[in-house]
Amino acid sequence: MSNVSSKGKSLSAKPGVEHWITRPTADGDIKLFLWQKAMTGGATSAGTRRGTVLFVHGSSMASRPTFDLEVPGRADSSPMDWFAARGFDTWTMDNEGYGLSDKHRNINFNIENGADDLAAATDYITRTTGAKQFLIYGISSGALKAAVFAERHPER
């Protein structure tokens, strides 16, 4: 995807970067998959990025097909690319039980668990990039996970 900034300079998202984190639970550790895209041209340091967006999927889908689907001929099909091209550091993750993240615990993957996953993800993103506050965008039950997370962690 490519866009043109107000200065006529071409902006585009970098290829995605895969990240893995481990979240401890009462039943043992779980591995969670995170996906990151940022703008090319070095605009990803804490001093130059416009913000950090964390996209949260719903209950019947995984993160990348929802937020980073690239459709040939449709430049704005990936919300991650759209925001990255405008200077945001963008992240998404597969909550436990979805996509590439662990699915081995015999539990109901509910809103509370999703909010716990978001806390682990934002801890990791803060350690990795220095971001301290997040713009959280959730769809379907992802919006509920984001709301519970925001209620628990208003400082983020």
Positions of the model-derived regions?
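N-terminal cap/lid segment of alpha/beta-hydrolase-fold proteins
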Residues: N3-T48
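Short, solvent-exposed loop/turn and secondary-structure capping segments
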Residues: L34, A46, P65-D68, S101-H104, ...
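Short, surface-exposed "cap/lid" segments of acyl-processing enzymes
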Residues: G41-F88
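Catalytic nucleophile loop
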Residues: H57, T92-D94, L135-I139
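Glycine-rich "HGGG/HGxG" loop immediately N-terminal to the catalytic nucleophile
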Residues: A62-P65, W91-F109
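Glycine-rich, phosphate-binding/catalytic loops in enzymes
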Residues: E70-R74, N108-F109, H153-P154
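Conserved acidic catalytic loop of the alpha/beta-hydrolase fold
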Residues: A115-Q133
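Conserved hydrolase catalytic core segment
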Residues: K132-Y137, S141-R156
